[in-house]
Amino acid sequence: MADSERLTAPGCWAACTSFSRTRKGFLLFAEIILCLVILICFSTSTSGYSFLSVIEMIFAAIFFVVYMCDLHTKIQIINWPWSDFFRTLVAAILYLITSIVVLVERGNGSKIAAGALGLCAAGLFGYDAYITFPLRQQRHTAAPTDPADGPV
């Protein structure tokens, strides 16, 4: 039993980690790391703003695991492209608002760093929303140019 698990484990691990090399995988990983850094900066200065970083880090980690393990093809009751688009769009808007409020308040160095990193996170989430937009990914087929009824 242990030998069969050992033989299938590298294949499973390779399948799971191959997602992290894609553009979407890299973006989700960067979102998780950036949310963690912003959380650390907010927790040292003002803990009231850390809720956004915690929630977005959890959501990004959930989507990372779902896409990494290919669960989005197995769980089809959820429309994953639209869910991911709305997650990133809401995160970009909330990070933009929160960062502007934090930078206007002017606090200590870690609060200013969190505000500046929040603006970077808003840009990252906005870019992720742009590339995730489901209607942008649909390909339109060209209309037929030949007459269907024959020569006129």
UniProtKB/Swiss-Prot annotation:
Topology within the bilayer: Multi-pass membrane protein
Pfam families (alphabetical): MARVEL
Carbohydrate attachment residues: N108
InterPro entries: Marvel, MARVEL-CKLF_proteins
Keywords, in A-Z order: Glycoprotein, Membrane, Transmembrane, Transmembrane helix
Transmembrane recorded as keyword: yes
Keyword Calcium: no
Ranges where the MARVEL domain occurs: 19-137
Highest taxon, organism lineage: Eukaryota
Residues annotated as transmembrane: 25-45, 48-68, 85-105, 112-132
GO cellular component terms attached to this protein's record: membrane
Function (record text): May play a role in cell differentiation in the intestinal epithelium.
Name listed for the protein in its UniProt record: Proteolipid protein 2
Organism: Bos taurus (Bovine)
Lineage start: Eukaryota, Metazoa, Chordata, Craniata, Vertebrata
Gene, per the UniProt record: PLP2
